[in-house]
Amino acid sequence: MALSKEDILKWLEEAKTAEVVELITAIEEKFGVTAAAVAVAAGPGPAAGAEEQTEFDVMLVSFGDSKINVIKEVRAITGLGLGEAKALVEAVPKAVKEGVSKADAEEIKKKLEAVGAKVEIK
């Protein structure tokens, strides 16, 4: 007489833990399998496959109330002439520096924010 699925489930409900462990061990040996949980293959996470960003752009978003001081700081950072620095500041949002390291980008951001500018690092 073959056992039905219901018969097996009923036996498992009534069996002691030791009996279930013995059954699992016997099944593992008989069929060459393990009862270890199967890891589900998940898709890549949001950052998987993407390289860590090494170059950053410092974007001037707003010059705030101190346009002249921001122009002076942009000149010091970029080495641009007065007219070029003024045009850059007035063309916000605009990149002040592109392709710089994270440390340099943070330093530039700090300098510009100190004179009243609003800055983003991208």
Swiss-Prot record:
GO terms for biological process: translation. Signal peptide: none annotated. The keyword Chaperone does not apply. The keyword Ribosomal protein applies. One of its GO terms (molecular function) is structural constituent of ribosome. GO terms for cellular component: cytosolic large ribosomal subunit. Keywords: Ribonucleoprotein, Ribosomal protein. Homodimer. Part of the ribosomal stalk of the 50S ribosomal subunit. Forms a multimeric L10(L12)X complex, where L10 forms an elongated spine to which 2 to 4 L12 dimers bind in a sequential fashion. Binds GTP-bound translation factors. Forms part of the ribosomal stalk which helps the ribosome interact with GTP-bound translation factors. Is thus essential for accurate translation. Belongs to the bacterial ribosomal protein bL12 family. This is Large ribosomal subunit protein bL12. The lineage of its organism: Bacteria, Pseudomonadati, Spirochaetota, Spirochaetia, Spirochaetales. The gene is rplL.
